[in-house]
Amino acid sequence: ETSRPLEAEEYERLKAALPEALEGCAAAVLSDYGKGVLLRRADGSCLAGDVIAACADRGIPVLADPKLDDWGRYAGAECVTPNSAEFAAVSGCAGETREGMEEAARALCRHIAVPRLLLTRGARGMALFEEDGDPLFIKAEARQVVDVSGAGDTVIAVLAACRACGLSYARAARCANAAAGMVVRKAGTSPVSREEFLYAVRRDGGSAPKIMDLPQLRELVACWRQ
């Protein structure tokens, strides 16, 4: 495994594949693991920017889970979703106060030309900062943390799915928080089922039923056992 930027042939092949890959796409995710595919090349070209430009031409929202320190690669995306360590490394803000986080997040968004940032804060939940509007701080959902593997991937996947359905970022962030709360209760990298997700979102919104019939109870218990 290497983490070098793409060679010219690799870059051109991936770039040429974008139009077909984006057919029927309602949202796009740049899940950057710092392995090289989304790195800026020596000539300044960058597949991340090409994806964002192609999506902009088609009206497709792009969300990025950032890595390393060159977040300018995500310029034009709708949102970046760093964790606390990634945010602190790039912004210089360790998150001691909400005011400090907001100031640092807004400055960072202006610098990288991205209108919003969803900060995942582990046991402290999430914080959504948008260029227009007040910050939104969301408490963590998990009562018991078993394994945090896959939580970040779950957050951006649910966030993108919600945006593809037309939800606001505030509502999408709450849905992502609910889903992440389900994931960290499971051992290993485990998915969230549709039933689990709907139950978590309804509970978060106060609409989860307190009285259920036997089939509903069986379905819920099956989710808990997974």
Which functions belong to the PLM regions below?
Residues 33-135:
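Conserved phosphate/ATP/ADP-binding segment of small-molecule kinases
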Residues 1-30, 190-211:
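Conserved N-terminal subdomain of the carbohydrate kinase-like
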Residues 138:
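Hydrophobic residues at beta-strand termini and immediately following loops
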Residues 11-12, 60-66, 214-215:
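Short gly/ser/thr-rich secondary-structure transition/capping motifs
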Residues 111, 115, 141-203:
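Conserved post-catalytic alpha-helical subdomain immediately downstream of the catalytic base
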Residues 30-33, 226:
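Active-site donor-nucleotide binding/catalytic segment of nucleotide-sugar enzymes
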Residues 28-31, 83, 126, 153, ...:
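Conserved structural-core and active-site-/substrate-pathway-adjacent residues in large, well-folded domains
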